[in-house]
Regions:
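Membrane-proximal transmembrane or re-entrant/amphipathic helices at the cytosolic face
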Residues: 424-427, 451-512
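Helix-loop junctions and terminal segments of transmembrane helices
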Residues: 29, 58-74, 147-148, 206-208, ...
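Membrane-interface junctions at transmembrane-helix termini in multi-pass inner-membrane proteins
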Residues: 3-7, 133-161, 181, 347-379
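Alpha-helical transmembrane segments of multi-pass membrane transport and lipid-handling proteins
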Residues: 88-114, 172-175, 299-354, 384-392, ...
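Transmembrane helical elements of multi-pass membrane transporters/channels
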Residues: 8-28, 40, 162, 186-198, ...
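Membrane-interface helix-loop junctions in multi-pass transport and translocation proteins
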Residues: 32-39, 153, 164-196, 370, ...
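N-terminal membrane topogenesis motif
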Residues: 1-24, 78-85, 120-123, 150, ...
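Interhelical loop/hinge segments that connect adjacent transmembrane helices in multipass membrane
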Residues: 1-6, 181, 198-242, 285-288, ...
């Protein structure tokens, strides 16, 4: 059942995300055609401002979901209801905090923008973004019950359908009215509709959530708040690393640069969301496995899933380095391109982040938040300081470079240490050394494939979609050949190959 739910979670997420991805690129094409770069910059900037306000969440969601894995596995309805009551109470407090801080920031908005004079109704635009953040905390907490029961595909299916409708409506509004305010109103209300549907379904499917009104016992709350305390530092790091780039860029380079960068972020966001449905689909299953069977098989499962994540992120990182400018030129135009140096730095940061993902999934599923709490604080400080120093000389490349440097000095070595030392435990030093050897080889593989592919593509035309497909196929062949040569005989590759062949045979025979 664990494996089946993981696969359903993954398939539902992938199909919906593919449709959303196609529509989001279509919507962005319409956006840049009907509105200016400054509006695109505002869209990215305010998104990051609200991302910073999410610091008020303090990691409550992750801590609560981790606490639900065991009672869900044991079907302890009373304990689940108690945890959900606490979740609701905490998220109401968060919503009020976000609203208060968000309103207090309004007078300072003009100081964050350079070149935003041509954008009308800035305060109204900001209020719409703020309302979207506040309502998400008031309405979305019942999603957690599906995550605990490994049924996140139900929430994802609703979210993807409503998301597709939202994108279509936003495209229609831009084409017919060119009105950014109406565009944002749709962006505000459609997620509220998603939450309302999930809320109603959860009440029908889990009626015991209304039956019990009390909160968890004081000792249980203490354990949860301990995890929240650790996760708050992780949340701080995430906010500073992920939500300050556009703020610094806007202040030093202007909204137009933020607009250009937002197109690259759109591509990476869609790729990340796509891959997140694959890696994230296993989080609840890992937590469920740990709750029922302990950590005996955790390392073996980690090796396989971590290798699978490398194949996905490695393949896409190399492809993005060689082809992302070709794609952006075709979709948005020459004026929306960054130099190749900036592109390499952006994708290097994407690959570093990708190689961390499976380790983070295991950390979350195993509840190892406490052990690397100060790492998060160090990462945040280094990122902010280095980005502010480098942006003056190197611009966008300096901002992203700050993120890379902070990751290399903290996350890249300390996160696997925590996982092996406190999650795997047995013979952890040997396993940690093996992890770092694998990490270096993976970088060499992706860098080599990217360099060879880029050199070949410079000898080819970059004029139309057909050549884009041809170059994508050539890159795929090169990557596959190198992976087979380097990893073809490893246990992880053999396991994934055998599992894929077995699934295909079942499908061909009409099996499940």
């Amino acid at each position: 059942m664990r494996k089946k739910n993981s696969i359903i979670n993954m398939i539902v997420g992938l199909v919906g995300q593919l449709l959303n991805m196609l529509l989001s690129f279509g919507g962005r094409m319409v956006f840049v055609h009907y509105l200016s770069q400054e509006y695109l910059g505002v869209n990215g900037l305010f998104g990051d401002v609200l991302g910073m306000l999410n610091l008020a969440e303090l990691g409550i969601g992750s801590a609560m979901i981790f606490s639900m894995y065991r009672p869900a596995a044991q079907n302890d309805e009373k304990q689940l209801a108690r945890l959900m009551n606490l979740y609701r109470t905490l998220y109401r407090i968060v919503a009020l905090a976000v609203l208060g801080i968000g309103l207090a920031l309004m007078p300072f908005l003009p100081r964050l923008m350079k070149g935003g004079e041509g954008v009308e109704n800035l305060q109204l635009i900001y209020l719409l973004y703020l309302l979207q953040a506040v309502t998400s905390y008031l309405l979305s907490y019942k999603n957690a019950i599906y995550q605990a029961y490994q049924k996140a595909y139900i929430r994802k299916a609703v979210d993807q359908i409503i998301g597709i409708v939202r994108l279509i409506l936003q495209i229609v509004v831009l084409v017919t009215t060119r009105n950014f305010i109406l565009y944002l109103i749709i962006q505000l209300f459609m997620p509220m509709l998603t939450s309302a549907i999930i809320w109603a379904r959860a009440d029908r499917e889990f009626p015991y959530l209304k039956q019990y009104k009390e909160l968890p016992e004081p000792q249980e709350r203490k354990a949860i708040f301990k995890n929240v305390g650790a996760l708050s530092l992780h949340k701080l790091a995430t906010v500073i690393v992920r939500s300050t780039d556009n703020l610094i860029m806007s202040a030093f380079d202007g909204l137009a640069t933020v607009g250009i960068y937002s197109n690259y972020k759109l591509v990476l966001m869609n790729v990340n969301n796509l891959l997140g449905h694959v890696t994230g689909a296993f989080t609840a299953s890992i937590g469920n496995l740990n709750a029922l069977e302990g950590r005996k098989r955790v390392y073996e499962i980690f090796r396989i899933l971590d290798f699978a994540a490398f194949l996905l992120y490695g393949y896409l990182s190399g492809g993005l380095v060689t082809l992302i400018n070709f794609f952006i030129r075709m979709i948005f135009g020459e004026e929306y391109l960054f130099s190749m140096t900036v592109v390499v730095i952006i994708i290097a940061e994407f690959f570093i982040s990708g190689l961390r993902q499976m380790g983070l999934q295991f950390r979350e599923a195993l509840g190892l938040f406490w052990y690397d709490r100060y790492k998060a604080l160090a990462e945040a400080i280094i990122n902010l300081v280095v980005s502010l120093i480098l942006v003056r000389r190197f611009g966008v490349a300096g901002i992203i470079g700050g993120t890379i440097i902070s990751s290399l000095l903290t996350c890249v070595w300390f996160e696997p240490y925590v996982l092996m030392r406190y999650g795997i435990e047995e013979d952890w030093q040997k396993k940690l050394r093996r992890y770092f050897m694998d990490y270096i080889v993976r970088w060499v593989v992706v860098a080599g494939v990217s360099a060879v592919s880029y050199w070949i593509f410079q000898l080819m035309p970059q004029t139309n979609f057909l050549w884009f497909i041809v170059q994508g196929l050539i890159y795929t062949a090169i990557f596959a050949a190198v992976v087979l040569t380097v990893y073809g005989r490893t246990p992880e590759f053999q396991y994934l190959l055998e599992m894929t062949v077995r699934k295909l045979k079942k499908k061909l025979r009409g099996g499940e």
